[in-house]
Amino acid sequence: MRVKGGTVSRARRKKFVKLAKGYRGQRRINYKVAKQQVYKSYLYAYRDRKNTKRNFRKLWIARINAAARMNGLSYSKLMHGLTLAGVELNRKMLAEIAVSDFDTFTKLADQAKAALSSDNVLVQARTAATTDTTVSVER
């Protein structure tokens, strides 16, 4: 006699139909369509877990940029100035400070400006020392 494995097959099919709860139409009733949709849902979930990280980073950068421009700096100059000043705050924390405590963010922006101005003086001195305007080529 052939063994068909009825209870195992039924349990497997019920599992997919149960996972498809909340879908519209045949996607929640029909096993074959439900299985395809559940697999597709897993792909969407995987993709969007990655996209969530990107979207939050974009949001944080937009918030930091808006607050930086209110203090007379661009985003890139603010971040470079904070790096020069030795401030090690990530974008998430900077965005939270910009939204909730603008006075503290202004102090951080002032630190960045000070670090940028001192670095700018060093860069100008370095370029002045390396620039030689009396170059002559003899032929």
From Swiss-Prot:
GO terms for molecular function: rRNA binding; structural constituent of ribosome. One of its GO terms (cellular component) is ribosome. GO terms for biological process: ribosomal large subunit assembly; translation. The keyword Ribonucleoprotein applies. It comes from the Bacteria. InterPro entries: Ribosomal_bL20, RIBOSOMAL_L20_CS, Ribosomal_protein_bL20_C. Transmembrane segments: none annotated. Keywords: Ribonucleoprotein, Ribosomal protein, RNA-binding, rRNA-binding. Binds directly to 23S ribosomal RNA and is necessary for the in vitro assembly process of the 50S ribosomal subunit. It is not involved in the protein synthesizing functions of that subunit. PANTHER family: 39S RIBOSOMAL PROTEIN L20. This is Large ribosomal subunit protein bL20. It comes from Leuconostoc mesenteroides subsp. mesenteroides (strain ATCC 8293 / DSM 20343 / BCRC 11652 / CCM 1803 / JCM 6124 / NCDO 523 / NBRC 100496 / NCIMB 8023 / NCTC 12954 / NRRL B-1118 / 37Y). The lineage of its organism: Bacteria, Bacillati, Bacillota, Bacilli, Lactobacillales.
